[in-house]
């Protein structure tokens, strides 16, 4: 490709409304342009990257035995009513009526459509297992789209769905998809971690997320220093306390604490050990008999809302009680709450169950109890794992301790079980002629999200540093003063032909531009390899080669340059 015949829309200035580096660089490098909130057009360079990501995804899915199909983005509402998600999904589901007043949605996901398709097409166990995938545009009406294509309303996704008669074949397909996803991200040259994950709104049992590691990642990953164990912070298991509860050594005291509204203020003003304090959080209950529930964690720990949401006594989705409701029920506000004398179900974290002589709110404004002890001052409450893990704690496999990293979720695989097939009556006849509800798996990759995540992991102060496999072009040719030197023009043109003939994606900058502008554009758009041609190089019979990632330069003889560049891509 020649720059003179290409839409290379680079920008010097960083757009003011771009928050994260991938959004900034995709705009500056001329990869995307915003059409509306959360909606983007892909310009040529952006589309080239997107298509390369898509090609790798497709190749690995095909290798894993999945079969490609294509389903409509527009879906009939009656399928969503059938599974109950018409009411459950919320405003992210964009709904509309056609000219015949029939309800439709723009698909954020395709479980309903694929299950409907399979229940009509598959009738015998002999047709199973079956793994179908598509690469299709999705739409979620995010309340606040942000971060460019990282969290846009319209996005490109690969979603696969597998169908099984037994858990053995579901497990086999799940493992195949796990490996395929690992292969996809490895081939793209990205540092990543698969992690245990919560199944979220899609539901199911087993679930893993695939995270591209980046300091800007929204997700916190807890992983073991001594094994492959890794989990999203929402899913990471807290260790059970190894110590036993100590004997009471202090009397229960009611203390005035007028200026201590937070744990930090309480600890600072009274010289307390933060591990001897607790936080009490009031949430909505799941039953009329218990409309409010108290959740208690140690003062230095944080409540894990995903874990709390799964408690039987707690309403789902988790909802914190408003202050007015808390005051009406307890007589005190947040900052002064505690377990002593609290007339509602109490669930404590396991770490709280072994505490003694601890401090908590007294359920009276501006007062706390010091020296609280279980069984002496109140009954020991129900205990559960309801907190986030902490760095340095032992991991569940016993092979290391927790360390933390930030990641960007780009893939998610689920074992759905019968969540959708049962509600939609997707069944087949087994070998005995009996009707069996299909088991399902679901496997998603954010194709457009990978593009942004790759940039978040691969950039410097000059622009994008693309991994070889997904760069828009592999090689950039920079002829110095091309329009003033016939020698430079002739050699640049010949090199362009030779590299193109060798199957290398090459961009020839044939503009009448200053060298500084040409170099800046090549570095901004992130081309991995640059070849500079000038009269001095020609006199010496060499090209000047520069590596975008390392910055290293070297001279390469004319007759060796094609093989040299091909070897770099091998």
Curated annotation (Swiss-Prot):
GO terms for cellular component: cytosol. One of its GO terms (molecular function) is proline-tRNA ligase activity. Disulfide bonds: none annotated. Its EC number is 6.1.1.15. Keywords: Aminoacyl-tRNA synthetase, ATP-binding, Cytoplasm, Ligase, Nucleotide-binding, Protein biosynthesis. Catalyzes the attachment of proline to tRNA(Pro) in a two-step reaction: proline is first activated by ATP to form Pro-AMP and then transferred to the acceptor end of tRNA(Pro). As ProRS can inadvertently accommodate and process non-cognate amino acids such as alanine and cysteine, to avoid such errors it has two additional distinct editing activities against alanine. One activity is designated as 'pretransfer' editing and involves the tRNA(Pro)-independent hydrolysis of activated Ala-AMP. It is found in: Cytoplasm. One of its GO terms (biological process) is prolyl-tRNA aminoacylation. It is an enzyme of class 6 (ligase). It comes from Shewanella oneidensis (strain ATCC 700550 / JCM 31522 / CIP 106686 / LMG 19005 / NCIMB 14063 / MR-1). This is Proline--tRNA ligase. InterPro entries: aa-tRNA-synt_IIb, aa-tRNA-synth_II, aa-tRNA-synth_II/BPL/LPL, Anticodon-bd, Anticodon-bd_dom_sf, Pro-tRNA-ligase_IIa, Pro-tRNA-synth_IIa_bac-type, Pro-tRNA-Synthase_IIa_type1. PANTHER family: MITOCHONDRIAL RIBOSOME PROTEIN L39/PROLYL-TRNA LIGASE FAMILY MEMBER, PROLINE--TRNA LIGASE. The keyword Protein biosynthesis applies.
């Amino acid at each position: 490709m020649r720059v003179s015949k290409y839409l290379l829309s680079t920008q010097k200035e960083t757009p003011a409304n771009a928050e994260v580096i991938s959004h900034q660089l995709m705009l500056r490098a001329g990869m995307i342009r915003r059409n509306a909130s959360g909606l983007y057009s892909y310009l040529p360079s952006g589309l080239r990257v997107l298509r390369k990501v898509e090609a790798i995804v497709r190749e690995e899915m095909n290798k894993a035995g999945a079969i490609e199909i294509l389903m409509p983005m527009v879906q009939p509402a009656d399928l969503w009513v059938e599974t109950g998600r018409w009411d459950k999904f919320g405003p992210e589901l964009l709904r509309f009526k056609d000219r015949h007043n029939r309800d439709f949605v723009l698909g954020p996901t395709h479980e309903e459509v694929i299950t409907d398709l399979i229940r009509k097409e598959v009738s015998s166990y002999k047709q199973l297992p079956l793994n179908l995938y598509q690469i299709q545009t999705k739409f979620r009406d995010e309340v606040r789209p942000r971060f460019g294509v990282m969290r846009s309303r319209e996005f490109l996704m690969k979603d696969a769905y597998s169908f099984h008669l037994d858990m053995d074949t579901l497990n086999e397909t799940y493992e195949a998809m796990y490996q395929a996803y690992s292969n996809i991200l490895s081939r793209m040259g990205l540092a990543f971690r698969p992690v245990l994950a919560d199944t979220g709104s899609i539901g199911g049992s087993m679930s893993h997320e695939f995270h591209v590691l980046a300091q800007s990642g929204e997700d916190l990953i807890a992983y073991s220093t001594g094994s492959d164990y890794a989990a999203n912070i929402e899913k990471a298991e807290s260790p059970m306390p190894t110590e036993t509860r100590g004997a009471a050594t202090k009397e229960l005291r009611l203390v005035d604490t007028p200026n201590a509204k937070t744990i930090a203020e309480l600890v600072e003003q009274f010289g307390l050990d933060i591990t001897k304090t607790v936080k009490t959080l009031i949430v909505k209950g799941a039953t009329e008999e218990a409309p409010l529930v108290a959740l208690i964690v140690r003062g230095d720990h944080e409540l894990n809302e995903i874990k709390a949401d799964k408690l039987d006594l707690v309403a789902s989705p988790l909802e914190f009680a408003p202050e007015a409701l808390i005051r009406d029920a307890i007589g005190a506000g947040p900052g002064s709450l505690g377990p002593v004398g609290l007339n509602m179900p109490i669930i404590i974290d396991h770490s709280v169950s072994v505490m003694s002589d601890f401090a908590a709110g007294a359920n009276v404004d501006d007062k706390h109890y010091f020296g609280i002890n279980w069984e002496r001052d109140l009954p020991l409450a129900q205990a559960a794992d309801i907190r986030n893990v902490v760095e340095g704690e032992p991991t569940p496999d016993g092979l290391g301790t927790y360390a933390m990293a930030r990641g960007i979720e780009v893939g998610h695989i689920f074992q759905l079980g019968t969540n959708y097939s049962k509600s939609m009556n997707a069944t087949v006849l087994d070998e005995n002629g009996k009707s069996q509800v299909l088991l399902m798996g679901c496997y998603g990759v954010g194709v457009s999200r990978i593009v942004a995540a790759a940039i978040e992991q691969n950039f410097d102060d000059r622009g994008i540093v693309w991994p070889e496999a997904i760069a828009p072009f592999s090689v950039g040719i920079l002829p110095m003063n091309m329009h003033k030197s016939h020698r430079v023009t002739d050699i640049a043109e010949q090199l362009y032909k030779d590299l193109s003939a060798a199957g290398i994606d090459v961009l020839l900058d044939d503009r009448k531009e200053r060298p500084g502008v040409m170099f800046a554009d090549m570095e901004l758009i992130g081309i991995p390899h640059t070849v500079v041609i000038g009269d001095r190089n020609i006199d010496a019979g060499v090209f000047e080669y520069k590596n975008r990632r390392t910055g290293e330069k070297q001279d390469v003889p004319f007759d060796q340059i094609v093989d040299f560049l091909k070897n770099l891509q091998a």
